Amino acid sequence: MGFSEWNLIWIDLEMTGLDPSRDRIIEIAVVVTDSNLDTLAEGPVLAIHQDRSLLDSMDEWNTRQHGRSGLTERVRASTVTEAEAEAQVLAFLKQYVPARTSPMCGNSICQDRRFLARWMPDLEAYFHYRHIDVSTLKELARRWSPEVAEGVRKSGNHLALDDIRDSIHELRHYRREFLRMPA
């Protein structure tokens, strides 16, 4: 299956912190699935160059996490700007999904949308205004069916492509075990 308004765009960003007014995007990845959550294509996975002073100002959690994963060094070595990353991702998505048809899919996706609106507005505008936020099902399962929530295993390495794969896997799990729908 190729180009379709029913395809879903999954996105994840890694950032220097949680405040889009002062923090920046340092990694972006996208995956396109069909409506049954079968992967059609994995898009660009890009470390985005940011100034050393910004990287040096990250809080302890981000410094440790992105240092351990190797992302900080990838960002330092990268020559890709936010504008170039945005253009590459848009060019990829236009092969699979018409503009403003796919909800933004991922985990805690509102946070990613806030950063896209600030730093990559053309990409943010490519999405429909709705979301498929896997974290909603996670929170409901934790409250209503804890055994279902406990059945989810994630890589936890906080790299954008791995986080997307984890989110798709997690939604498949909730579809099967929580929503009780066949795959």
Swiss-Prot record:
EC number annotated for this UniProt entry: 3.1.15.-
Example GO BP: DNA metabolic process
Keyword list, A-Z: Cytoplasm, Exonuclease, Hydrolase, Nuclease
Molecular-function GO terms, alphabetical: 3'-5'-RNA exonuclease activity; nucleic acid binding
Record Gene3D superfamilies: Ribonuclease H-like superfamily/Ribonuclease H
One Pfam family of this chain: RNase_T
EC main group: hydrolase
Domain Exonuclease: 8-171
GO cellular component, as recorded: cytoplasm
Keyword Nuclease: yes
Main location: cytoplasm
PANTHER family registered for this protein in UniProt: OLIGORIBONUCLEASE, MITOCHONDRIAL
Name this protein carries in UniProt: Oligoribonuclease
Organism whose genome encodes this protein: Halorhodospira halophila (strain DSM 244 / SL1) (Ectothiorhodospira halophila (strain DSM 244 / SL1))
Lineage per the UniProt record: Bacteria, Pseudomonadati, Pseudomonadota, Gammaproteobacteria, Chromatiales
